[in-house]
Structure formats: structure tokens, C-alpha cells
Amino acid sequence: MRTSNYLLSTLKETPNDAEVISHQLMLRAGMIRKLASGLYTWLPTGLRVLRKVENIVRQEIDNAGAVEILMPVVQPFELWEETGRSEKMGPELLRFTDRHSRPFVLSPTAEEVVTSLVRNEISSYKQLPLNLYQIQTKFRDERRPRFGVMRAREFSMMDAYSFDIDKEGLEKSYQAMHDAYCKAFDRMGLEYRPVLADSGAIGGSGSQEFHVLAESGEDLIAFSSESDYAANIEKAEALAPTEEVAAPTQEMELVDTPNAKTIAELVEQHGLAIEKTVKTLFVKASDEVEADIIALIVRGDHELNEVKAENLPQIASPLEMASEEEIRALVGAGPGSLGPVGLELPFIADRSVAVMSDFGAGANVDGKHYFGINWGRDVELAQVEDLRNVVEGDLSPCGQGTIQLKRGIEVGHIFQLGNTYSKAMNCNVLGPDGKSVILEMGCYGIGVSRVVASAIEQNHDKFGITWPDALAPFQVAIVPMNMHKSERVKEAAEKLYAELTAMGIEVLFDDRKERPGVMFKDIELVGIPHTIVIGDRSMDEGNFEYKNRRTGDKEAIAMDTVIEHLKAQLA
């Protein structure tokens, strides 16, 4: 490709609204342009990378035995009503009506559509197992699109759906897709980890996320220091403490704390150790309990894990905190003065809270706290659950080592759905005994456009992007110095360009009338792995200059061996 025929569109300055490095570099390298909030046009350079990700994913998913189809982006709303997800998805599900007032949605995912397809096309166990996938545009009406294509409203996604006659078959399909994901991300040159995950709105019995490790990641990943255990912090279990509850050493005392409305203020002003305090949070209860509000109690230095709380049957889903007005109407005090003593509401305590003694908590009166609280003596402990986020140094749930935390960007997710959708949509076949069997489903997604941004988060320097070879928009750049003034430079560049392209090597030939410095900066910014510089001075010595983008190394290469050198670098 000649730059004279190409839309390179690089920018010198970083746009003000670009927060993370991938967004900044995708704009500066001319990969994308913003059309509206969360909506982007993919320019030629970005599209070349996107297609490379798609092709690697397609090859590995094909190798796993899946079959490609293409489903509509526009879906009938009635399918979403069949599964009950029309409300569960909330405002992220963009709804509209056509000219005949028929309701539709823009596809955020395709479980309903593919299940509808299979129930009409498959009738016998002999047609199974079946795994169907597509690479298609998706739309989710994000409340706050940010980080460029990392969290956009419109995005490219590979979504696959497996159908099996039984759970054993589902597990085989699931493992095959897990392995295909690993092969795809390995080929892309990404540092990633598969981690245990919560199934969220998709549902099902088990799932794993695939995270590209990056400091800018929105998710925290918990790892064991001594095993392969890894889980999203939403899923990572905080084990019950092994120590016994210590005997009381203090009497419970009501203390005036007029200026302590937070745990931090309580600790600072009254000299308590933060691990000797608890915070009490009021949340909306589900229909499982008679009360409208239920209290959750966690240690003062721990954070409530909202996903764990939401998964408890007593808690309304989605999790909703009680307002200050609701709290005051119930106990007559504000959120900073709540505690378990004398509380006439059901409450659930975290495992770490259950072994505390001589601790401090709000007295359910503004400006007052109880110190020296002990379970049994001062307040009865009823229900205990895992409510908190794990922290570094916790024992690993696998029983080996301790927890370490790193940030990750979710680029893939696989689910064992079971019969959640097939049962709701009456998707069944005749089994070997002639009886009707509800199919077992799996679903699998890779955020193709998000992979592009994630790769940049892992592969960049102060000059621009340092693509892994498999994802680079071009393999080789040719930079001819002053070719419009030097005929022999032009001839050498044209000859090399013709030879490389004839070999199927992807080349960007910078034939612009630009200063060499501008050309070099653009090539570095875009991140082309291998550059050949052709100039009169080096040609006088019978050489071209080779530069490796990732290492920055430069070397003189004999003109008649440059192709062999490049072939070795690209091997």
C-alpha cells in the first residue's frame, strides 16, 4: 500500500477527551474517529488490525468445530420477552418500533435469536453437537461510554452458541472453546489469564472470563501465589477466618462521636484500629424476606462485594442501596451511625465480622457509636455469608498460597448456560429413546474491537504502538529518503516494494513528499514492526538500513540480502 493512495490520518497532538493510552494512540495513529458518544468510524489502519483479530478468532473457532452464520442486528422484542431478559437487561437494551409499531431491539447478544433458529432447524439428537458462531456488530446503550472502543456503545463481537444433548456434551463443548480462546490469544501475542467469573445477566451455572493484563484494566483479578487459581474479584471467595473468636476484654460502651460520620473519621478521632470497626449498609430486600430493607455488615477495612450480595436470595436484584431518607425513616439516624446493636431489621454479617470481638459500630443514633461490642453477649449473630472483596494476602480459595491482585481488561467470556434459554424457549429434540430432551447450551463471546485496544494497552512506548507481529496493520514499512529528488532511491524503493508485495508481505510504502522526520514519526506511531530505510548515503555503501520497532535496534543490511533478512524477521 502506498501512502499516496492511503488514508493515514495521524495526529501530532493527543485529543483532550482521550483518557487511556489505547484511546489516545488509536486516535493519533489514525485508527478510529469519533462520530458520537460511544460510536466510532474505523479508518483503514484500524480496520486492518480489526480484521487480523477477526481472522485469528475465526480460524481458531473454526478449528474447534464451530460453524459460522450471520444473524440480524435487529431482533424482535418478543424473543426477549420469551426468556424474560427484556427487563433484566435494563436500559442497555436499545428498543424501538418500526413503521407498523412492532417492537424491536438492537442486538447486544444473540442467545434468543440463535435458540429460536435451532428449535426450528434441529429435531434429533443425531444432529448434535452443534456450535454456531458469528462475528457481528453489537449495540449496548452504555450509560457512560468511555475509553474509546474499550467501552463503546457499538462494537464488534464474536459470539458462539453450542447445543448438546446432555451436560457431559456441554462440558466438552465448553472445554473446546476454552482451548480455542487460549490458542487465539496466544497467537495474538497477548499476556492474558482465564479467570473464574460471575455469570451476570447472561445466566447459567458456570463461566470464565479472559482478561488481558493491563494497569488500565477496569477489573481486578485475584491470583493465587502458588497455583493456577484466578478469579474476577467479583467471584473470588473470601474464606472464613481460621482463628477462634477471642473472649471479650471490654464492656460495651456508648460513646459520643459527633464528628465521626465515616469509618476513617471514627478511626482517626477515637483511636480505634480500623480492623476493629464494622460498617453497616442498608440495601433493598427481595420478596424472600418480610422486611423491605436488610442490613449487610462488613469489617471497616473491607469493601462490600455487590455481586456476592446480589446473588443472595434475600437481596433484591439488581442491588440497590437504601436512601438516607429511607434509613432515617427506619432507625432515626443517618448512614454513618448504623450498627447491629438494637437493630430491628434482619442483617447478614460477613465471615470476617463473625469472628470479631471488642469492636465498634454505629449505635443507630446520630453522633453515637458503641465500642467494645461482642457477639452473643451484646447482639445475636444470625446469618453469616461471604460478602466482601478479597484483599492481597488473603488465603487463596484453592488452599494453595495467598491472593495477589492485578488489573485486567475483559476480552472474552464463556458460559455454561445449561437449559436456561432452551427451556424458556422450548428448544428440544428427540433423544435416543424417542423422548423429548431439552438442549444444554453454552455461549461464548470475544470482544473483537476491545482486543485491539487491549493489545495497545500492553504494547506501546513513548513513540507510539509496538504491535505484536500478528496484529500489526502492516508487516514492513519502506521509507525512501528524498525519493522525489533521487532517482536511484526511487528505483530501489519501487523494486523492493514490488518484490515484497509479490511475496504476499504487507508493506506500507511511504511515497509522500514529506521530511524524513515526519515519515519516521508516523511509522513509529502506527507501530509497523519492521522498517527499511533507503537513502543515497547508505546505498553508496551498498546497504539499506533496517530498524526493529519493538527493540529500536538499527543495522545496515546489504541491499542484495534485505529480503532474506526480512523473511527471517517475519518467520
Swiss-Prot record:
The family database entries (SUPFAM superfamilies) matched by this protein are listed as: Class II aaRS ABD-related, Class II aaRS and biotin synthetases, YbaK/ProRS associated domain
- Name a GO CC annotation attached to this entry: cytosol
Reaction catalysis annotation? tRNA(Pro) + L-proline + ATP = L-prolyl-tRNA(Pro) + AMP + diphosphate
BP term (GO), one: prolyl-tRNA aminoacylation
Recorded GO terms, molecular function?
aminoacyl-tRNA deacylase activity; ATP binding; proline-tRNA ligase activity
Against Pfam families, the record matches this protein to: HGTP_anticodon, tRNA-synt_2b, tRNA_edit
Q: What is known of its domains?
A: Consists of three domains: the N-terminal catalytic domain, the editing domain and the C-terminal anticodon-binding domain.
Q: What does this protein do?
A: Catalyzes the attachment of proline to tRNA(Pro) in a two-step reaction: proline is first activated by ATP to form Pro-AMP and then transferred to the acceptor end of tRNA(Pro). As ProRS can inadvertently accommodate and process non-cognate amino acids such as alanine and cysteine, to avoid such errors it has two additional distinct editing activities against alanine. One activity is designated as 'pretransfer' editing and involves the tRNA(Pro)-independent hydrolysis of activated Ala-AMP.
Assembly with partners or alone? Homodimer.
Any idea what this protein is called?
Proline--tRNA ligase
The organism is Vibrio atlanticus (strain LGP32)
